[in-house]
Amino acid sequence: MKFFKGKKDKTLDEAYDTLEKSVKGIDENIEKYNKELNVIKQKIEEEKKKNPINQHIINSLRNKAANIIQKKKVYENNKESTMGIQFNIDQIKYANDNVQLSIDTYKALKNTSKVLKKNIKKVNINKIEKLQDDLFDYIEDTKEIGNILSSSYDIPLNLDEQEIDAELALIEDSILDENVEQDNIASYIEDDKKEEDKNLLQQIPVEEKNFDAIQQKTKKETYFAQKES
């Protein structure tokens, strides 16, 4: 009976995160050493400006700076090594992702193949071809029906010269008859109008006729009088 479970193996992502935290800690230490070195640099410059210069203090500051630089370089080397491991993990993760993608693609294609195989069995190629042939025949029949319905009735056109001349003569006679009939109608209308005008003149009273005559006579006398003057 086991009372304690074994440690779970870390994944690449977990290992990468651990390295990322390590790099972050290294950067913090390097930044701290840079600040300390900057302070030492300023103190050395201040000591150099003093008169007389205290060389003992300057040497002590230089030794302290050398010690900090050594520690800083250790951290810089560790950072470079850690980042190299991170790069390798990135490469492995990339390769693993590609393999997993290939596996997923294979599974998807396999499942699709099964579905396609199942569905293709439901398709009868012969029936589809027959359906296509039937549709083509229906379309051709429809075109033929349309051509039949849109065609004009056959009219015999084989006429000899005598038949053509006879038809033309009939047309000329028909035109002449129409012209004569129109002339007769026009003449009848004109005669009828003249007869109506004659009747109207006969119905005008004698007084009106005399008045018209007097009016015409007056107009003539006025005209000649103006002319003589």
Curated annotation (Swiss-Prot):
Protein name (Swiss-Prot/TrEMBL)? Putative vacuolar protein sorting-associated protein 60
The similarity comment for this entry is:
Belongs to the SNF7 family.
Q: Which InterPro entries match?
A: Snf7_fam
Q: Is Transcription one of the keywords? A: no
Biological process terms in GO annotation: late endosome to vacuole transport via multivesicular body sorting pathway; vesicle budding from membrane
Alphabetically ordered keywords of this record: Coiled coil, Merozoite
The protein's organism comes out as Plasmodium falciparum (isolate 3D7)
Q: Name one GO cellular component term.
A: multivesicular body
From the UniProt record, list the coiled-coil ranges.
16-78
Q: How is it used?
A: Possible candidate for an effective malaria vaccine as determined by epitope response in sera.
Top-level division of the source organism's lineage: Eukaryota
One Pfam family linked to the record = Snf7
